[in-house]
Regions:
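Short beta-strand segments
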Residues: 81-82, 107-111, 164-168, 236-237, ...
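Flexible, low-complexity linker and terminal segments
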Residues: 1-27, 139-350, 355-359, 364-368, ...
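Short helix-loop-beta junction
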Residues: 44-51, 246-259, 461-465
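Thiamine diphosphate
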Residues: 1-142, 170, 229, 256, 381-502, 506-512, ...
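A glycine-rich helix N-cap at a beta->alpha junction
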Residues: 50-57, 100-111, 189-195, 432-443, ...
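Short, glycine-/Ser/Thr-/acidic-enriched flexible segments
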Residues: 36-37, 85-86, 111-114, 141, ...
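Short acidic, glycine/serine/threonine-rich loops at helix termini
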Residues: 41-44, 67-69, 90-94, 116-123, ...
Length: 512
């Protein structure tokens, strides 16, 4: 323990612990892209950037990591803050950075949305540890978050690769004490001798020099801990779920069960897990959101979890753990098979005073395939509007519409256009596709807190000569019918034309 390490008498939330770790690890450069549950963390980091680091909102996760890598190779510790689907976007430079090597430490915070409260999927960022061959931490408590960041920067510089830390909303909201210690300024540098190696040679170097360091770290870290029991039943967990498991095991009927909590899960700690399983007759794996740990150990025949139906896929609650413990005698159960519907969950409709409501009402009455995007427009897909047919990913609307069998319409927000949708528009022009693109410009990322969106109108007009700009008035029942009729006539006329047409709709988000 460092000499200056000390418990802070105040209890911190997970998000506050992350801020403290950024300050104490002497981070100098932070980039982030808005998206639940990462937005609140990035906003806090922006608020406190006078603490010695610079922080920047970025338009897209790939550029966020690339900018951080630029900071790294010039000696600045950097952090990248994204939501889980943002990991998909930054995966290209992440994969190659492992071969390329870095300079000062790079830590990526991946905000997972277990329960899909505000996301298009529930993907589990832990799998990026295996895919990218990087260390990945899954802390359980505010102290675990703080310690993970401090360890991650040191490990990143030793192994010369980025490190990923997975967080969730419940972890960020949880409270606990933090053992603080101040690290020295980094002296890590980027070694240009890497260019003496071929690409294959770089990968060989990684497995000879970097991977052994990561494997040693996961087998020796204090972040992975065992609470022994006096029964032959054991539980393995990771992340915030470890807290729920501990609470369950405080009940008298389950108090004797052993608990192995993994807060560093990549590289997978096979030795520790193998030893734990060998001492148990039965093992329950409790984790969010996919069976990452379970898939590594299911072949032992002792393990139960998501794959056996004992634990639900997605978010895990305390009652799920209790039910699983009560039914360990069953080899497989089918309790968690009911599919959630919008009716059972409750609808999340568009704001009734949205300036773009006339567009959605218009689209609902046009017999044309409409590709939506990961913004407010996706809320027009369910009943009662049913105005949008598809919605795959942020920035996907234009390319999706270009693939329709017959000419279709793409509806995309200005932030999604800047994030990645502009590439789809460039391809549409280059391929001479038949498509009508409706761009909703309110100059903010309305779904993620109102971050400013770049204005690409001049770029779009340069790309597409057939670009029309319309002002959308504040929505009222009096203005709706006129605006709806005007849009319907315009869109139908564009559908009769060949090539790419763009309709820019300018409106002000009433939430901002």
């Amino acid at each position: 323990m460092p000499d200056d390490a000390a418990f802070d008498t105040k209890a911190f939330t997970g998000i506050e612990a992350l801020l403290l770790s950024v300050i104490d690890s002497r981070v100098r450069f932070v980039t982030g892209v808005a998206g639940y549950p990462a937005t609140a963390l990035m906003e806090l980091l922006l608020k406190h950037q006078l603490e010695g680091y610079k922080a920047f909102w970025m338009t897209n996760e790939k550029t966020a990591l690339e900018k951080a890598l630029g900071a790294s190779v010039t000696g600045q510790r950097s952090m990248v803050v994204v939501k889980h689907v943002g990991m998909n976007v930054l995966s290209d430079p992440l994969m190659t950075s492992v071969y390329h090597t870095i300079g000062a430490g790079v830590v990526i915070i991946a905000g997972d949305d277990a329960g899909a409260r505000a996301s298009q999927n529930e993907q589990d960022s832990r799998f990026y540890g295996s895919l990218a061959e990087v260390a990945l931490f899954d802390p359980a408590t505010p102290r675990g978050v703080y310690d993970a960041v401090m360890h991650a920067f040191q490990l990143s510089e030793q192994a010369k690769v980025p490190v990923v830390i997975r967080i969730t909303d419940r972890l960020l909201d949880s409270k606990g004490h933090v053992l603080r210690s101040r690290q020295n300024e980094t002296t890590a540098t980027f070694d240009k001798d890497i260019w003496k190696l071929t690409t294959k040679g770089k990968h060989q170097r990684f497995h000879r020099e970097s991977m052994p360091l990561l494997e040693k770290a996961v087998q020796t870290t204090s972040l992975n801990w065992l609470r022994p029991g006096n029964s032959r039943m054991g539980i393995i967990s990771s992340g915030y779920i470890s807290v729920l498991v501990d609470k369950a095991l405080s009940e008298p009927r389950w108090k004797g069960h052993a608990h192995l909590s993994l807060q560093m899960v990549s590289p997978f700690p096979f030795d520790m897990v193998r030893q734990f399983i060998s001492e148990c007759d039965e093992v329950l794996v409790v984790e969010e959101t996919e069976p990452y740990i379970e898939s590594h150990v299911a072949v032992t025949g002792k393990v139960k979890g998501k794959m056996t139906g004992h634990i639900p896929y997605g978010q895990v609650e305390a009652e799920h753990i209790g039910y699983a413990l009560d039914h360990l005698g069953e080899s497989r159960i089918g309790k968690y098979t009911e599919v959630q519907t919008i009716k059972s969950r409750g609808s999340r409709p568009l704001c009734q005073d949205c300036p773009f409501m006339p567009l959605y009402k218009c689209l609902a009455n046009i017999d044309v395939m409409v590709a939506g995007d990961m913004g407010c427009s996706i809320r027009a897909a369910p009943e009662p509007l049913q105005a949008i047919d598809t919605g795959f990913a942020l920035g996907s609307a234009i390319s999706t519409a270009c693939g329709f069998k017959d000419k279709g319409i793409a509806v995309i927000g200005d932030f999604a256009l800047a994030h990645s949708g502009i590439v789809g528009l460039i391809n549409a022009v280059g391929s001479v596709d038949d498509v009508v693109v409706v761009i909703l410009q309110n100059r903010v990322a309305a779904m993620t807190g109102g971050q400013e969106a770049p204005d690409l109108m001049s770029v779009v007009k340069t790309l597409v000569s057939d670009t029309i700009v319309l002002e959308m008035p504040a929505y009222t029942s009096d203005t709706s019918n006129d605006a709806e009729d005007r849009l319907k006539g315009l869109l139908l006329s564009k559908m009769d034309q060949k090539g790419v047409s763009v309709v820019y709709l300018l409106g002000k988000c009433t939430k901002q």
